[in-house]
Design a protein with these regions (language model features):
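Small-residue-enriched hydrophobic alpha-helices in membranes
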Residues: 1-139
Length: 139
């Protein structure tokens, strides 16, 4: 088992509140990297779409993933409930942008983005095979 698979196992064992705390820290790291290196109007929104990219691997957002997004972004100036992030991600076809970002970002930014994806996907207690496959494909 490699580093990334062990990290997935670790996040799957965390409680929801710990995952929310970790997701906040990681989303800030992703947001800050996007702010420094990408030409986007809303770096936080773009960071959220990075998370949605990993959440979308299995085709839907379950209740725990939605709750994590609500907890994470409820005090931000973004007019989307947790259950609408995935719909916005799909509606505006963020996948090509996210994949380009992941291909071109620094190693440390990629690690933060992958860990952010893991935390979101682990919020229901496990990372589904499709989510795991998407995460590990970037390692």
């Amino acid at each position: 088992m490699n580093y990334w698979e062990r990290l997935i196992d670790v996040y799957e064992s965390w409680d929801f509140d710990s995952l929310c705390d970790e997701a906040y820290e990681l989303s800030c790291a992703v947001r800050d990297d996007i702010r420094r290196n990408c030409n986007v109007r809303e770096p936080l929104y773009a960071a959220i779409m990075v998370g949605a990219y990993f959440m979308d691997a299995d085709g839907f957002a379950d209740g725990a993933e939605v709750s994590l997004f609500r907890n994470l972004f409820e005090n931000q100036l973004i007019d989307l409930g947790g259950d609408r992030f995935l719909a916005e991600y799909r509606r505006y076809n963020w996948q090509p942008w996210v994949e380009s970002y992941l291909r071109n970002c620094s190693k440390s930014a990629l690690e933060a983005a992958l860990r952010f994806g893991m935390v979101i996907c682990a919020s229901d207690g496990f990372i589904r095979d499709e989510e795991r496959e998407r995460i590990l494909s970037w390692t």
